[in-house]
């Protein structure tokens, strides 16, 4: 990731992508399973569905997180995009004004599937906002470091899903 000088109010984004040697049906089975997504995360420790046993538009889940600098916290997310074999997206805290938004999207590519994970910070304040408030002169660095952490975590998630889908 290259330095962009972004601040939190810019609602910066991160995107990672990988090609998986498996059909979209197999990749979707894993990408739409929030438990499988959490398995490889250093930060997202576990999830619990609040409204049933799986993803659907409007379903909610609680995510339990841990970060060495930010501590432990939980969030409630709502599924805001759900098109089988295509996209699974959720907004954290408030769908109308999320603290972050996440999306896993699939596209057939050759004999396999392109899986892309995207996320956006903000626009609503989050735990990161507290760190920025404490040292506002370092906001760009704080945002950049956080985006790099998220990029590394997302890459690990896609690598994990790829390995599971291909074996």
Regions found by a protein language model. Give the residues of each.
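Short hydrophobic/aromatic-rich motifs at helix boundaries and adjacent loops
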Residues: 6-9, 48-49, 74-76, 129-134
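Glycine-rich portal/gate segments that line the openings of hydrophobic small-molecule binding cavities
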Residues: 48-101, 109-114, 152-160, 164-167
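Beta-strand/loop substructures that line and gate deep hydrophobic ligand-binding cavities in soluble
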Residues: 94-152, 161
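Hydrophobic ligand-binding cavity/cleft-lining segments
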Residues: 1-57
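Short, mixed-charge, low-aromatic patches
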Residues: 18, 34-35, 58-61, 113-120
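Short amphipathic alpha-helical segments with heptad-repeat character
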Residues: 21-24, 28, 144, 148-151, ...
């Amino acid at each position: 990731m290259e330095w962009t000088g972004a601040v939190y109010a810019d609602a910066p984004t991160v995107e990672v992508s990988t090609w998986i040697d498996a059909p979209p049906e197999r990749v979707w089975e894993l990408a739409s399973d929030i438990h499988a997504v959490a398995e490889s995360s250093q930060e997202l420790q576990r999830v619990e569905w609040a409204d049933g046993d799986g993803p659907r538009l409007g379903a909610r889940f609680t995510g339990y997180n841990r970060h060495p600098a930010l501590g432990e916290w939980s969030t409630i997310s709502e599924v805001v995009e759900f098109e089988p074999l295509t996209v699974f997206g959720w907004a954290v805290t408030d769908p109308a004004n999320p603290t972050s938004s996440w999306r896993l999207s699939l596209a057939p590519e050759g004999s396999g599937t392109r899986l892309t994970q995207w996320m956006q910070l903000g626009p609503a304040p989050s735990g990161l906002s507290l760190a920025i408030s404490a040292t506002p002169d370092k906001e760009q660095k704080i945002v950049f470091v956080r985006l790099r952490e998220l990029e590394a975590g997302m890459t690990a998630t896609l690598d994990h899903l790829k390995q599971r889908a291909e074996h």
